[in-house]
């Protein structure tokens, strides 16, 4: 069975997903007028605006922190380690490329989610890919298919991957029994997810910035302490990225392929651009300024923080400790722990264990919120179905600590590809709407006015929207 999963992965990620992700990212980069570069100077202002509370939804900052909670998981640690193990230091460069290109894709999917959001019976905004497939494309069957993929991925598999990383870290540092790890983590997860969307969002708006700052500051201090090695480490990333070192031996093509494949895979698992997960958090926000593009820009910040800051920090630690080769026999998170033990002394591995627990716990909780959101689309938002999902998440967390690492990542990669193919197909079909959103936002910015989305200006789009999602805005 592992060989079968490996074969499926090689087909999907050997060519299909790489071309699709790269092509979609380039398309939306051009279609939105290089949105990730145009508004990069606005990131600070967008973060400031994101704190404004608005009726009917989360603040944009709460939405960002919820999406970051899902993004900033073991993929930022174990995923980076796996990418370097399989693809060499050059995988880091391709993670950067995937992140920059993915920012445009994320802008597209999150803007669409914000545009096609609707209110539930409690007045809370709900939305995501399933909604824009149903409303924007008129293909509810496609939305149902995506929602099922997401429930499998975020309700089951991805939480198991995060739990697996926690177990690996605790086993390496303290020889902790896997079953005990799983039960404790599952209990804390259950306590958190019963708080609901608003409760989780309030928890994450304080929790996520704190854990990210701890990891990044620690990494910066270590980099400064080893500043003499940094030029060599940075050069090794670029040298390996293009196969220059292996060219003389005739292995450049294979090495380049491995670097690109693993860089794109791990970047996507970490920042989730194009996968269709982040739009579930983006749609829950009452955006400020009241324009879909504003939420798209805020969520681009999440990719910048996740991959270009946190993942890069993890990569630097691994490469500083062993130039990407010394500890290759170790798997995933244990490679990071060994690197930190080399760089920080005996307590380095224990510090990584703490960080992994924080990252993985926040990710599991946010994963559940995404899955629960799609129960609403499937009209299964009754107490029985919700508690069934909670129990399933509880069991998956325990099970994740007992399964092997390669199997967990193979399953994650396959379901991630299924989600991405469905979502990317939808947003590419909706690219004229994305272009309209980006152009409308830019037009108002050039006029020097606060961007406000008015559905009456675009009647073809307005007819597709939920009646009460943008009514207040159009009346301003």
Regions found by a protein language model. Give the residues of each.
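N-terminal alpha-helical transmembrane segments of multi-pass membrane transport
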Residues: 1-74, 84-91, 102, 398, ...
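Membrane-interface loop-to-helix entry segments
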Residues: 20-27, 31-44, 164-170, 176-238, ...
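Flexible loop linkers connecting adjacent transmembrane helices
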Residues: 34-59, 82-92, 96, 104-137, ...
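Alpha-helical membrane segments and immediately flanking helix-loop junctions
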Residues: 54-85, 112-130, 134, 151, ...
């Amino acid at each position: 069975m592992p060989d079968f999963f490996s074969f499926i992965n090689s087909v999907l990620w050997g060519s299909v997903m790489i071309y699709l992700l790269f092509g979609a990212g380039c398309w939306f980069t051009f279609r939105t007028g290089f949105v990730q570069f145009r508004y990069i100077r606005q990131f600070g202002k967008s973060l400031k605006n994101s704190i404004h509370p608005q009726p009917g939804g989360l603040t944009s900052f709460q939405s960002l922190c919820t999406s970051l909670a899902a993004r900033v998981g073991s993929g930022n640690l174990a995923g980076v380690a796996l990418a370097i193990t399989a693809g060499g230091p050059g995988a880091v460069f391709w993670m950067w490329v995937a992140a920059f290109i993915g920012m445009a894709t994320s802008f597209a999917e999150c803007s669409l989610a914000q545009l096609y959001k609707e209110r539930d019976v409690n007045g809370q905004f709900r939305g995501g890919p399933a909604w824009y497939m149903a409303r924007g494309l008129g293909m509810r069957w496609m939305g149902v298919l995506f929602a099922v993929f997401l429930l499998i991925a975020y309700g089951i598999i991805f939480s198991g991957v995060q739990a697996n990383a926690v177990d690996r870290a605790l086993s390496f540092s303290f020889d902790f029994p896997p079953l005990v790890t799983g039960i404790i983590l599952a209990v804390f997860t259950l306590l958190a997810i019963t708080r609901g969307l608003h409760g989780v969002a309030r928890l994450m708006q304080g929790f996520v910035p704190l854990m990210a700052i701890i990891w990044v500051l620690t990494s910066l201090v270590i980099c400064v302490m080893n500043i003499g090695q940094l030029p060599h480490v940075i050069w090794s990333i670029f040298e390996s990225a293009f196969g220059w070192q292996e060219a003389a031996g005739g292995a450049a093509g294979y090495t380049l392929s491995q670097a690109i494949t693993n860089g794109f895979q791990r970047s996507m698992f970490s920042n989730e651009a194009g996968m269709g997960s982040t739009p579930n958090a983006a749609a829950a926000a009452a955006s400020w300024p009241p324009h879909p593009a504003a939420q798209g820009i805020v969520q681009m910040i999440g990719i910048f923080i996740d991959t270009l800051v946190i993942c890069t920090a993890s990569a630097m630690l691994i490469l500083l400790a062993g130039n990407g080769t010394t500890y290759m026999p170790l798997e995933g998170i244990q490679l990071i722990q060994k690197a930190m033990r080399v760089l920080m002394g005996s307590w380095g591995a224990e510090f990584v264990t703490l960080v992994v627990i924080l990252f993985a716990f926040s990710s599991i909780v946010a994963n559940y919120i995404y899955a629960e959101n799609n129960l609403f689309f499937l009209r299964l938002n009754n107490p029985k179905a919700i508690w069934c999902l909670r129990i399933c998440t509880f069991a998956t967390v325990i099970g994740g600590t007992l399964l092997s690492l390669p199997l967990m990542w193979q399953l994650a990669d396959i379901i991630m590809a299924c989600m991405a193919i469905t979502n990317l197909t939808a947003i590419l079909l909706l690219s004229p709407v994305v272009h309209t959103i980006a152009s409308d936002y830019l037009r108002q910015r050039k006029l020097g006015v606060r961007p406000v989305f008015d559905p009456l200006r675009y009647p073809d789009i307005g007819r597709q929207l939920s009646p009460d999602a943008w009514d207040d805005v159009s009346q301003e």
